[in-house]
Amino acid sequence: MATVVAFHAHPDDETLLTGGTLAKLSAAGHRTVIVVATDGHMADLDGRKPLRLGELAASAAALGVHRVVHLGYADSGHGAVLYADPPDRMRFARADPEEAAGRLAAILREEHAEILLSYDRNGGYGHRDHVRVHQVGKRAAELAGVSRVLDATLPREGYTRLVRSLERLRVPFRYDPSVLASLFSPRSAITHRIDVAAQAAQRKTALAAHRSIVEGSSRFATIAKVLLRLPTPILARVMHWEWFAEEGATPGSGAPLDDIFLPAPR
């Protein structure tokens, strides 16, 4: 059996991008580990236990994940302003990439990881912490000698259609059309498409674990509320697939593979 490490920016990111794949791997007997760069909090915790890390632990348990590790950073936020660091920790966007990569590499070595799941170079929807996850993840794999890095992503063309459909339904989910052209990855870059329909119930439970976010008013909360209202069989159809782009693979080299342990052509 293999060990797969999924590197994420914030608690809740694991549910939509890799939740089904992690649940599927765990059920098959593989060891799965989530490493989260930030605790998801912007402010000073003043000695309090990070609420969102507790939610992540519940989400990971629903997915069957064996271990969760926090790298120790604070959320950097997604707005135009990068705020000052809280007194007790550094924002991930300000962290020295080499130091952060060293922390992640130590975990990869300890776990004897065979595959690292990370993010695409655009950071998906462009959050500064997601972009940094791509940079740090790629470097950590080099340091730890992990030869295969799969970037969790979405096919840009499908995501664009989804956003436009939501706008037509008057769901408050807006993107500048010029920004849509640089989100996630073009379909030609997708190397793996994993069928996770059977993991819909686990993903739903994992998503619901992030109550502090689901009950909010963010873009993620808008998506989460819609998904959680769906009956599980419908959710299985909506969230049927998870997509990955393998680092170093030849773009457009054929139909996406259906198993992350199958290497993409280089």
Regions found by a protein language model. Give the residues of each.
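Active-site rim/loop-helix segments in enzyme catalytic domains that contact anionic ligands
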Residues: 1-112, 139-143
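Metal-dependent de-N-acetylase/amidase catalytic core
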Residues: 1-5, 83-84, 94-266
